[in-house]
Regions:
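Solvent-exposed beta-strand/loop surfaces, strongest in extracytoplasmic domains of secreted
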Residues: 1-224
Length: 224
């Protein structure tokens, strides 16, 4: 690029009547070219994924340096049509212009929290559900809502469903999660029988409620 001189010499066909003409010149200006920067619109990503070469992958038709904004490694908040920008500086600055701002749009989808909830150990009838059973965790802060709720006493039975819904604190970047389940077995309880040794009796005294007075912690029938 720059100002250049063009020259020409002319030889006439009819040299008998015409002289040659030498060194006729003109000036020409060669302007710098503007590089063609190509940058395909990146596919949507999920919140938590840092920007990298998959998204920041502009190319040009001449060698040079790309500077991206936001930079590689940035974690964008969730949202549609967020602007990514790149500036391009050509290596051959004598013949190419810089390209200050090429942009594309990217969508960042909300992330779905990862809920971890191991199946609880079996419990015995009469044990209320509590933190030992209702102990799901998530990879982001939030609130768990259990069904049945803490304090519930389940009837005995195998493979009973416990369910939890999770509402993240950061609703801008995370989805809610519903219907995560585990199974719990509630074993039958063994009644507690209380029966104090009766006082001595005399031979011939018939056994009665005075001696046959066992009690249990649940309703039922005693057979002596």
């Amino acid at each position: 690029a720059g100002n250049r001189t063009l020259s020409v010499n002319f030889v006439p066909t009819n040299t008998a009547n015409y002289n040659n003409v030498n060194n006729i010149t003109v000036q020409i200006t060669v302007n710098k070219a503007t590089p063609v920067v190509t940058w395909p619109t990146p596919v949507a990503i999920t919140y938590g994924a840092p920007l990298g070469v998959t998204q920041l992958n502009a190319s040009a038709n001449t060698a040079g340096t790309f500077v991206y904004s936001p930079a590689s490694g940035t974690v964008l908040n969730a949202g549609a049509n967020q602007t990514l920008s790149v500036s391009f500086t050509p290596t051959d600055a004598s013949n190419f212009n810089s390209v200050p701002a090429t942009t594309v749009q990217i969508t960042v989808n909300k992330a779905t929290p990862v809920i971890t909830w191991n199946a609880p150990a079996a419990i015995v009838y009469g044990t209320p559900l509590g933190a030992t059973q209702l102990n799901a965790t998530a990879n982001t802060p939030g609130t768990f809502t259990y069904t049945p709720a803490s304090g519930t006493i389940l009837n005995a039975g195998a493979n009973q469903v416990l369910s939890v819904n999770f509402a993240p604190s950061n609703t801008n970047n995370f989805n809610s999660v519903t219907g995560v389940t585990v199974l719990i077995t509630v074993n039958k309880a063994t009644p507690v029988i209380t029966w104090a040794n009766p006082s001595p009796i005399s031979y011939g005294t018939a056994l009665s409620a005075t001696q046959l007075n066992a009690t249990a912690n649940v309703a039922g029938t005693f057979t002596y």
